Amino acid sequence: GVSGMSIEDTELPQPFGSVGRTKLLSIPEGVGKMKAALDARQDPNLIIAGRTSAPGVTNMEDALERAMAYEKVGVDAIFLVGVKTKEQLEKISDAISIPIILGGGGSSDMMDLDYLSEKNVRICLQGHQPFSAAVKAIYDTMKALREGTPPEELQGIASAELMKKVTNITDYENMFDKYLK
């Protein structure tokens, strides 16, 4: 099931004609969204992270103000999109005590796992490269098949062992035995 969700302070849906220009809600509106999610939570184990793109959309002072306001209202974590430097991360980390989730890649010197852990970063997403790699692999495979490559000659195919691992074959077999036999 779902164990966590992020509630963002981005103006959604984007108004007509504003493509590429992210706008943020006011801080009081953002706080209201966070409070609504917290009040609606029925499972106390569900993590609610307050998400803001302020580091990349406005400035760090605004991001800091938002992070502190969302922590004060009671979110379980802060999800920041657009933090690019250690200095930016340290400003946030020094100001709040709840876990930090980073979205989007920062500078390479910032991606040290021990450093991130020291700064209370618990999740660090580094973009959509895995999805992009999967799209390219699917495209290349379909193109090769269309051009006549026999399936047994395709390159980059996952081994049977890897397929069993990533598809949780044991869980599947257990459910099959439990429900379908």
PLM-predicted stretches and their roles:
Residues 145-181:
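Flexible C-terminal active-site loop/helix
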Residues 2-128, 132-144, 172, 177-181:
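Alpha/beta enzyme core
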